[in-house]
Amino acid sequence: MKLIALCCLLLLGLLGFLAAPGVASPSRHTGPGNGSGSGAGSGNPFRSPSSQQRPLYYDAPIGKPSKTMYA
């Protein structure tokens, strides 16, 4: 009985510890640069102020469909 209670307390403690930093961390969508969308103040630490978004490149070029005839 004590072992089950100890396991439950340990599990609740781990869940509380893992959930607590997420509550304290600031949201990406709120902050000083909410309307700008880019720059160092927008909450994105990986985007530099002078960088522009690059176009999306696919892994393989998309060509015309083959003319395979299925019976």
From Swiss-Prot:
Keywords: Immunity, Innate immunity, Secreted, Signal. Its main location: secreted. The keyword Signal applies. Hemolymph (at protein level). Residues 25-26 form a propeptide. GO terms for cellular component: extracellular region. Residues 26-71 are annotated as: Disordered. Residues 1-24 form the signal peptide. Not induced after bacterial challenge in strains carrying a loss-of-function mutation for Toll. Constitutively expressed in Toll gain-of-function mutants. One of its GO terms (biological process) is response to bacterium. It comes from Drosophila melanogaster (Fruit fly). Induction: By bacterial infection. Detected within 24 hours of infection. The keyword Secreted applies. This is Immune-induced peptide 18. It is found in: Secreted. Residues 32-42 have a biased composition (Gly residues).
